[in-house]
Amino acid sequence: MSTNTVPSSPPNQTPPAASGIATSHDHTKFNNPIRLPISISLTINDTPNNNSNNNSVSNGLGILPSRTATSLVVANNGSANGNVGATAAAAATVETNTAPAVNTTKSIRHFIYPPNQVNQTEFSLDIHLPPNTSLPERIDQSTLKRRMDKHGLFSIRLTPFIDTSSTSVANQGLFFDPIIRTAGAGSQIIIGRYTERVREAISKIPDQYHPVVFKSKVISRTHGCFKVDDQGNWFLKDVKSSSGTFLNHQRLSSASTTSKDYLLHDGDIIQLGMDFRGGTEEIYRCVKMKIELNKSWKLKANAFNKEALSRIKNLQKLTTGLEQEDCSICLNKIKPCQAIFISPCAHSWHFHCVRRLVIMNYPQFMCPNCRTNCDLETTLESESESEFENEDEDEPDIEMDIDMEINNNLGVRLVD
């Protein structure tokens, strides 16, 4: 297993000052700063070598070519294809004067390119679309910029797809935390199985550039890959997996067969592998996930979101006498468009932070701030609720006070 950080000039030369790689993609929090482009192989074993500087050459892994180097691209059928660019996303890409090509798609590499590559037309993806399928029309620059993040990279988000039609929890697939990956045009993100060798490799690079790996034995070590072109179009490919890749419940190819590149859309459902032994153990469950592309999952705060959050803060201030701006569990700020849980005692937290406390003794809940016990299943028509409302009849109208304070802050005068 090796991780190669690719220089912007041939290895035997000192990189020029203007390398064409954005300095914002340097990650100094690592002992060895990571710069794009980067490349990882998940399948080829490293070969011991006395000269550690030549390991990437002697073990047959190779490195990604520099922008000016002549490159050899191994196509899906194992033959050299000189008509495609240096960032071919369906094969191992190596320098012709550095390392031999590995003629198998199972040695497919994970590589991430930076944004704004020079001579973009020379770095076109090696895309093989299914019959009767064509690429979408090219988009204008304003639309293209909206698809990018602030660094000029495209993004993809994977979240677990909970199959509500399944009667068994075991058949709902493997649960995982949301995964977000970012990549420049021409990049390829490997999908595979999590192993110790993978762990060692990805520990050297930032999370957003990791391969997409899962702890499930029904997924091949190199199961498939995502590709992204210069228009922000994302593609899915099965790379000879044994248990299959499914897009919207349709298998892409038969076992141990490389599939075509299928264009992805927001909301598509992907399944990796099939349950083994009934999926009774998590390690034998398939992975079902929904995809969201190019920041489409991000919510923009509007006036309603901001006003709702302001009401929550004012409610806490009026009921507890304290102004709470941060989540007391994670100590981060509570912001608009975030999922928030508000307890009957008016304390609030990020739902992600308090979820375990909510489900631990549900429906009983003890506030971690004031230690108040409450019943989350109490109905609005219960006697205790009615008594609570009657006791508060003589109390000032908290809601009116909140409205007054919000409008005063906004410079608006209430008129009866």
From Swiss-Prot:
Its EC number is 2.3.2.27. InterPro entries: Dma1/Dma2_RING-H2 (IPR042823), FHA_dom (IPR000253), SMAD_FHA_dom_sf (IPR008984), Znf_RING (IPR001841), Znf_RING/FYVE/PHD (IPR013083). It is an enzyme of class 2 (transferase). It is found in: Cytoplasm. UBC4-dependent autoubiquitination occurs at Lys-150, Lys-204, Lys-217, Lys-237, Lys-240, Lys-260, Lys-300, Lys-306, Lys-313 and Lys-317. UBC4-dependent autoubiquitination is responsible for DMA2 turnover. UBC13/MMS2-dependent autoubiquitination occurs at Lys-237 and Lys-306. Lys-204 and Lys-306 are also ubiquitinated in trans by DMA2 E3 ligase in association with UBC4. Keywords: Cell cycle, Cell division, Cytoplasm, Isopeptide bond, Metal-binding, Mitosis, Transferase, Ubl conjugation, Ubl conjugation pathway, Zinc, Zinc-finger. Present with 2790 molecules/cell in log phase SD medium. SUPFAM superfamilies: RING/U-box, SMAD/FHA domain. This is E3 ubiquitin-protein ligase DMA1. Residues 189-252 form the FHA domain. It catalyses: S-ubiquitinyl-[E2 ubiquitin-conjugating enzyme]-L-cysteine + [acceptor protein]-L-lysine = [E2 ubiquitin-conjugating enzyme]-L-cysteine + N(6)-ubiquitinyl-[acceptor protein]-L-lysine. Induction: Protein levels are regulated by nutrient status, being high under good nutrient conditions. A zinc finger (RING-type) spans 327-371. It comes from Saccharomyces cerevisiae (strain ATCC 204508 / S288c). Residues 1-30 are annotated as: Disordered. GO terms for molecular function: ubiquitin protein ligase activity; ubiquitin-protein transferase activity; zinc ion binding. Gene3D superfamilies: 2.60.200.20, Zinc/RING finger domain, C3HC4 (zinc finger) (3.30.40.10). GO terms for biological process: cellular bud neck septin ring organization; establishment of mitotic spindle orientation; mitotic spindle orientation checkpoint signaling; protein autoubiquitination; protein localization to bud neck; protein ubiquitination; regulation of formin-nucleated actin cable assembly; septin ring assembly. E3 ubiquitin-protein ligase which functions in cell cycle retarding in conjunction with the UBC4 and UBC13/MMS2 complex, 2 E2 ubiquitin conjugating enzymes. Involved in nutritional control of the cell cycle. Targets the G1 cyclin PCL1 for destruction. Required for proper spindle positioning, likely regulating septin ring deposition at the bud neck. The gene is DMA1. GO terms for cellular component: cell division site; cytoplasm; cytosol; ubiquitin ligase complex. SMART domains: FHA.
